[in-house]
Amino acid sequence: MLTSGIVILSGGLLDPNPGLIFWTAVTFVIVLLILKKFAWGPILGALEEREKAIQSSIDRAHTAKDEAEAALRKNKELLTKADAEAEKILREGKEYGEKLRADIVEKAHSEATKMISSAKEEIEQEKRRALDELRNEVADLAVQGAEKILMANLDADKQKAIVSSMIQDLSKHRN
C-alpha cells in the first residue's frame, strides 16, 4: 500500500530473522577467532611494553627526586661554606689596623655578598630545575595513572570500541 509516497510494508525492523541471527553469530565467531589469532598477541605486547615504560618513568622520577635532594643538600653545604668563608674574611678584616680596617671590611662584605648571592642564585636555579623536572615526571605519571584508571573504569562497549580502535591503529602502523 502506498501512502503519501511512503511504502508501508508488513513486518518491520524489529521482527526477528533467524537466518540473519545465525549468520551474524557465525560472522562474530569468525571475527573473534581471527582477532584472537592475529591481534591478541600484539595487544598484550603493547600493554606489557606500556607497563614497562610506566615503570621506567616511575624509576626515573625516583632517581630525579634523589638527585634533586642530593643537589639541594650540596647547595646547602655550599651556602654554609660561603657563610663561613664570609665570616672568616670579616674576622681577618678586624685584625688589621685601624687605617686599613674600612677597606678590608668593605671588600669582605662585597665578596661575601657576591658569594652568598651567587650561591643563592645557584641554589635557586638548581631547585627550580629539579622541581621542574620532578613536576614534569609527576605530571606524566599522573596522566598515565589517570589513563589506567579510566581504562579500568570503562564498560564493555567502551572497551570493545577501544580495542577496535587499537586494532585499527596497529593495522595502520603495520601497513
Curated annotation (Swiss-Prot):
Gene Ontology MF annotations: proton-transporting ATP synthase activity, rotational mechanism; proton-transporting ATPase activity, rotational mechanism
Compartments where found: Cell inner membrane
UniProt key word Phosphoprotein: no
Pfam families the record matches: ATP-synt_B
Transmembrane segments: 20-40
Annotated membrane topology: Single-pass membrane protein
Keywords, sorted A to Z: ATP synthesis, Cell inner membrane, Cell membrane, CF(0), Hydrogen ion transport, Ion transport, Membrane, Transmembrane, Transmembrane helix, Transport
Similarity-based family: Belongs to the ATPase B chain family.
NCBIfam families: ATP_synt_b, PRK14472.1
Subunit structure: F-type ATPases have 2 components, F(1) - the catalytic core - and F(0) - the membrane proton channel. F(1) has five subunits: alpha(3), beta(3), gamma(1), delta(1), epsilon(1). F(0) has four main subunits: a(1), b(2) and c(10-14). The alpha and beta chains form an alternating ring which encloses part of the gamma chain. F(1) is attached to F(0) by a central stalk formed by the gamma and epsilon chains, while a peripheral stalk is formed by the delta and b chains.
Job of this protein: F(1)F(0) ATP synthase produces ATP from ADP in the presence of a proton or sodium gradient. F-type ATPases consist of two structural domains, F(1) containing the extramembraneous catalytic core and F(0) containing the membrane proton channel, linked together by a central stalk and a peripheral stalk. During catalysis, ATP synthesis in the catalytic domain of F(1) is coupled via a rotary mechanism of the central stalk subunits to proton translocation. Component of the F(0) channel, it forms part of the peripheral stalk, linking F(1) to F(0).
The protein's name in its UniProt record: ATP synthase subunit b 2
Organism: Prosthecochloris aestuarii (strain DSM 271 / SK 413)
Organism placement in taxonomy: Bacteria, Pseudomonadati, Chlorobiota, Chlorobiia, Chlorobiales
Gene that specifies this protein: atpF2
